[in-house]
Amino acid sequence: MNKLSVYNPFVVGHYVSDEYFCDRRQETDFLRKQIVNGRNVVMISPRRIGKSDLIHHFFHQEDIRAQYYTFFVDIYATSSLAELAYLLGKSIFLSLKPRPRKWMEHFFQVMKSLRVGCTLDSMSGDPSFNLQVGDIASPEVTLHEIFDYLSQADRHCIVAIYEFQQIAEYQEKNVEAVLRTYAVSYTHLTLPTICSV
């Protein structure tokens, strides 16, 4: 991978690399201790404090990359359970693209409700995600399939949900309880959530 040239050593707005991540060792170690021990974590702070960068930094640690599958889903722009299910499905699908084809085939087998929008190019074999939010007829079923798929992975999965407070705005009620049920039911999964106040 090409090394990124950064002219300002005080990067704000996105994660670049360990080299440019300002000394958050305590927070990184605390997060590691919680996640490695299977605890679901809630991070709450005002905006622009670096919560998402901390998660990205944590996900880029060698031991975490070697032992876990990691997913970061920003739900700030969502307004429904269907949009949440769409973003979760898309995040997982896109992370599978570079993996061997058997992972993609397993994804299609488990994710029956998304199968219509996830296709393989007949010539190249490359996967594509051509699904729209409106294609998700039953978001509850899709969420169940997503978490079933993650529970079958050969490594523990960490799904960080950014701007988690957004679910309070959904028309559907008890979304937090539904996600909590998945977090508790699937021992192969950790759901750190990040909220801005």
Where are these regions (language model features)?
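Charged helix-capping and loop-helix junction motifs
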Residues: 175-178
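Conserved catalytic network of the ASCE P-loop NTPase/AAA+ motor domain
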Residues: 34, 150-153, 183-186
